[in-house]
């Protein structure tokens, strides 16, 4: 018996110790996963990486992932994090996978056959296609296209349904319900949580942010008869809060990740909790406290390290990928530290 197995967005990353640890935990699990056999076929919904411009470590993650795969074929629906235009040139993080004869990635709409099942791949794209249409314009009308409106056993996409997104957003596709009516199964990546529509969105393989905790993540599995079931995934990571110096809350995750409240620096947190994975430290008792609330404990002030605090701030900022800005700001702080 051969199965078609689907995994949601993976987001391999090394921009923090906890992201490295989660990536490592996933790779270790994947290598021994019982579905990872040469009888089965794997589909990935995209976003294998968190950032398209790769470090050496993430390149290593991608190579280890493909080296440990025993699947007969691996099919990837390209996501928005996988492909970027850098210096005017399209860059795909795992373009070197093209050298593998049993690995296929799809950067444009594609009809393929996997284990005798008809599959329509709808990858994410920015700008316009060769018809001058945006992703929203093109995919939203597929249900009435003479060619693509034909029945498929499976449709895999990397975008958001208009029912659960902002009006006019570039990652939004309309009429997904009509695609569902015309096809056997629609599976969407891109959205990391499943609670909005667990029958449509597979969700990411693990929580990439603190508001994405979910102990019920799953792979989707279709057997040769076309029947579907879910296979629960391990909890690769979990985001938790602890108020310094209280005991750490329990977690069954492979990588528990802590926000330490009432603590001004990672150095102080580690003096209490040792070698844990820290998302950030917060000087007050609430990460979202009001600007007027500036109270912190006396213990939290001791040993305050401005450079360490800056690094923590930068990791959680919207500009954390701007290496040049980080270097300039940190050098200025080093002169004053």
Spans of features found by a protein language model:
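Conserved beta-strand elements of the Class I
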Residues: 5, 118-120, 238
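Metal-dependent catalytic neighborhoods of phosphoester/phosphodiester hydrolases
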Residues: 15-18, 46-66, 83-100, 167-173, ...
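Conserved beta-sheet core of the metallophosphoesterase superfamily
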Residues: 162, 167-231
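Active-site neighborhood of phospho(di)ester-bond hydrolases with catalytic His/Asp-centered motifs
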Residues: 6-8, 42-47, 73-81, 85, ...
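N-terminal active-site segment of His-dependent metallophosphoesterases
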Residues: 1-65, 71, 138-152, 337
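Conserved catalytic scaffold of divalent metal-dependent phosphoesterases
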Residues: 75, 82-177
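Accessory, non-catalytic peripheral segments of nucleic-acid enzymes
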Residues: 36, 223-337
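Short, conserved loop/helix-junction motifs that constitute active-site signature segments
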Residues: 66-71, 147-149, 176-182, 251-252
